[in-house]
Swiss-Prot record:
Homodimer. The modification N6-(pyridoxal phosphate)lysine is found at K226. Its EC number is 2.6.1.9. Its cofactor is pyridoxal 5'-phosphate. One of its GO terms (biological process) is L-histidine biosynthetic process. The gene is hisC. Pathway: Amino-acid biosynthesis; L-histidine biosynthesis; L-histidine from 5-phospho-alpha-D-ribose 1-diphosphate: step 7/9. This is Histidinol-phosphate aminotransferase. It comes from Campylobacter jejuni subsp. jejuni serotype O:6 (strain 81116 / NCTC 11828). It holds the Pfam family Aminotran_1_2. GO terms for molecular function: histidinol-phosphate transaminase activity; pyridoxal phosphate binding. Belongs to the class-II pyridoxal-phosphate-dependent aminotransferase family. Histidinol-phosphate aminotransferase subfamily.
């Protein structure tokens, strides 16, 4: 059977390996997953209770207006319901943006190394990809590439903070850059980790209400998969002006998010104790990863996320990843990004200590 030609140029996205699979494959009793940037404390208690109370409604289709979650997000971000679209993860909203703006006759712009799904989704539309030479977000390079290909580029991705490297930019730098972009070019700010960046440095905080008030061509993406611990329920959102949101609704299938996910997301937003605990643990434990890197002369990029990336000169990241798997520790090998590096999710103190102990032995 023949398929569309663009599939010949696509690679499968490689998600983090599953705990049960690794336990069986390597014969280890205890497996620690530090690969997919999930919340190490699990699901928020308020969301768990909400799921218990609503489990008997799983047979019902969700309220397709999603009014409860939209109203909660609108209040949180000081925007209107009409400025919000809910997706099955922020990934789905990325798809909406790409299918709304890109085709085989235009292009998009992104950092040299960033979230892989941008390119995968865009290639489905036949769009051309321009990447900066810098692996991180160098806005001078972004500006030069945009100016050189302005007629082609109809969408720009800014992943802030960046996955899988962790760097971030000051909000003032971002807004200055957007001012130089034509109104017909959609600027997507993927803020999946922005709560972490804002906690670490207020200058990195991006406020969607201010962005969409100043710019008609900005889409702000948020997710419940990271800070809010709902990765398994697949729920995220986009915030933009009403014209953009209305266009996206033409691409959205009805009932695209489950009623349980919608309810749990509302409860998660209200669980301040859980999010505070997550953020405080993340950056106190992050410091231990920095100290470990310094001790072993491992290069890092200062991270504003819930993960840290280790870069190696002589050691091979694939070999290191395999040795960690044999010890029951799952991390993300970044060889598929063209990097000799590994990305490690910041876990609990117990998980991190086990990583340090085993990785110290491996590096000797």
């Amino acid at each position: 059977m023949k398929f569309n030609e663009f599939l010949n140029h696509l690679s499968n996205y490689e998600p983090g390996k599953d705990i049960e699979v690794i336990a069986k494959e390597y014969g280890v009793k205890e497996v620690i997953k530090l690969a997919s940037n999930e919340n190490p404390f699990g699901t928020p208690p308020k969301a768990i209770e909400c799921l218990r109370q609503n489990a008997n409604k799983a047979h019902l289709y969700p309220d397709d207006s999603m009014i409860e979650l939209k109203s909660t997000l609108a209040q949180k971000y000081k925007v209107q319901n009409e400025n919000i679209i809910i997706g099955a993860g922020s990934d789905q909203v990325i798809e909406f943006a790409i299918h709304a703006k890109l085709n085989s006759k235009n292009a998009f712009l992104q950092a040299g190394v960033t979230f892989a799904m941008y390119e995968i989704y865009a290639k489905q539309c036949g769009a051309k990809c321009y990447k900066t030479q810098s692996i991180t977000h160098d806005l001078n390079e972004f500006k030069k590439l945009y100016e050189a290909h302005k007629d082609e580029i109809k969408l720009i991705f800014l992943c802030l903070p960046n996955n899988p490297l962790g760097e971030c930019l000051d909000a003032s730098e971002v807004t200055k850059f957007i001012k130089g972009v034509d109104e017909d070019c959609l600027v997507v700010i993927d803020a999946a980790y922005n709560e972490f960046a804002s906690f670490k440095d207020s200058k990195k905080h991006l406020e969607p209400c201010e962005l969409i008030k100043e710019f008609d061509n900005v889409l702000y993406l948020g997710t419940f998969s990271k800070l809010y611990g709902l990765g398994g329920l697949r729920i995220g959102y986009g915030i933009a002006n009403a014209n953009i949101i209305n266009a996206f609704y033409k691409l959205r299938a009805p009932f695209n998010v489950s009623n349980l996910a919608l309810k749990a997301a509302v409860a998660a937003i209200d669980d301040d104790e859980f999010t505070k605990k997550t953020l405080e643990n993340n950056f106190s434990q992050m410091q231990l990863y920095k100290e470990f890197a310094k001790k072993h002369n491992i290069k890092i990029i200062d991270s504003y996320t819930n993960f840290i990336t280790y870069f190696f000169d002589e050691k091979n990241s694939t070999d290191l990843s395999e040795k960690l798997l044999k010890k029951g520790i799952i991390i993300r090998n970044l060889k598929s990004y063209g990097l000799n590096a590994i990305r490690i999710t910041i876990g609990t103190s117990y998980e991190n200590e086990k990583f340090f102990t085993e990785f110290d032995k491996i590096l000797r």
